[in-house]
Amino acid sequence: MSNFNVGFVIFPDLTQLDFTGPLQVLARLPQSTTHIIAKSEAPVPSDCGLSLVPTHTFANCPALDLICIPGGVSGVIGAIGDRETVAFVRQQAGSAKYVTSVCTGAFVLGVAGLLKGRRATTHWAYTDLLSLVGATYEKSRIVKDGNLITAGGVTAGIDFGLSVVAEIAGEVIARTIQLGIEYDPVPPFDSGHPDRARAAVKSALSSRYEKANLALRAGIEQATIL
């Protein structure tokens, strides 16, 4: 395989694990170069306070073989309202072999016009909004529709990264990366999905996510969908 350009588009207030989870996996893809792309060279603050340093700007980014958009509701609302960001994503996706997202990053793809008529997933709290960008929700942690690969919320980015490596370089390489990062999750609680979480746990989050859902809906409705 010739050198494979992987690019993550970052923006203020993104959820860092949406980005750093798959980054840790895809940075180990053989014969690849990882690019971290933002509007400018300035450090980009994430939603947990960790600042991220771009390697490229929109102006000097090479053509990408894989483009990945992380999520984070506040950051995504800003990104979909920024025409330069949306245009860059659409332009790079036009020639990329793989167009991908983690969590609510799917809505950046959607506003860029890349989810129309496609199957996709996102964080469980926002799946009802996928239809606003022309996508059909598929209930799965990872959804592949042609060259479009979307992942569920936050930690799904690690599973996504391993799935993409298997797609590109084969299962053996993906398995060696999984072992190398000791990805063998055994969570202390079985509350990682609404289908399994107790009612009291879901109730504790309901107000927060209802407000976030409404905010993201408003952001999508105000955005110019390409």
Task: List each model region and its residues.
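Structural detector of well-ordered beta-strand residues that form the stable sheet scaffold
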Residues: 99-100, 121, 138, 149
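Extended, subdomain-level signal for the structured scaffold at the beginning of enzyme domains
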Residues: 1-99, 106-111, 127-129, 137-139, ...
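Thr-Gly-centered strand-to-loop micro-motif
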Residues: 54, 144-145, 151
